[in-house]
């Protein structure tokens, strides 16, 4: 080993060995220093919390929905304007309705359509035209897929399963 030590002295490289390196260091509780990271975390949490906006609105009511394992579709062919509220009663039960007003006179069709479309709008439901005088009405939270309409128009007005 002396050869290595003499070679290191000749080159000018010395060991960086510290005599105090072997001493045991005992942690004294009086040496404890508060970390600024905790303060930073608290400030960061405070700033993050201030950016959160509540989406709850007291004016809206939760809507109870039926399980989607069974879907009931009601087909309505009203004879007069007095039958129009029955269609909306179905929507209020969170069920799907099909409105067929093909066989009615033009003025009765218009009155029923206006009543039903206004009620659907006020209930946040959706209405989609299938053919000229047939409409699908769904309550809030139900999506209408346009594939059925495409199949009916492709098959000259007939739906085939």
UniProtKB/Swiss-Prot annotation:
Name the principal localization, coarsely classed: cytoplasm
Which Gene3D superfamilies did the record assign? Answer: SepF-like protein (3.30.110.150)
Q: What's a BP term from Gene Ontology annotated to this protein?
A: division septum assembly
Output a single Gene Ontology CC term carried by this record: cytoplasm
As for subcellular location, the record says:
Cytoplasm
Would the keyword Cell cycle turn up in this protein's UniProt record? yes
Q: Which Pfam families match?
A: SepF
> Does the entry feature the keyword Hydrolase, yes or no?
no
Read off the InterPro entries from this record: Cell_div_SepF, Cell_div_SepF/SepF-rel, SepF-like_sf
Q: Which UniProt keywords are given for this protein, alphabetically ordered?
A: Cell cycle, Cell division, Cytoplasm, Septation
> What does the record give as the function of this protein?
Cell division protein that is part of the divisome complex and is recruited early to the Z-ring. Probably stimulates Z-ring formation, perhaps through the cross-linking of FtsZ protofilaments. Its function overlaps with FtsA.
**Similarity comment text for this entry:** Belongs to the SepF family.
- What does the subunit section of this Swiss-Prot or TrEMBL entry state? Homodimer. Interacts with FtsZ.
Report the PANTHER family cross-referenced here: CELL DIVISION PROTEIN SEPF
State the protein's name.
Cell division protein SepF
UniProt lists the gene as sepF
């Amino acid at each position: 080993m002396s050869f290595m030590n003499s070679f290191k002295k000749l080159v000018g490289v010395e060991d960086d060995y510290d005599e105090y390196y072997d001493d045991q260091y005992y942690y004294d509780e009086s040496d404890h220093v508060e970390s600024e990271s905790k303060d930073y975390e608290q400030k960061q949490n405070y700033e993050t919390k201030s950016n959160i906006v509540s989406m709850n609105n007291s004016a809206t009511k939760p809507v109870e929905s039926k399980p989607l394992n069974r879907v009931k579709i009601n087909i309505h062919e009203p004879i007069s304007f007095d039958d129009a509220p029955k269609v909306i009663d179905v929507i209020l039960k969170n069920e799907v309705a099909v409105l067929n007003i093909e066989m009615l006179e033009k003025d009765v069709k218009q009155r029923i359509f206006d009543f039903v479309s206004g009620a659907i709008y006020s209930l946040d439901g959706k209405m989609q035209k299938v053919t000229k005088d047939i409409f699908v009405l769904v309550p809030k939270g139900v999506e209408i897929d346009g594939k059925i309409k495409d199949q009916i128009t492709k098959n000259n007005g007939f739906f085939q399963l």
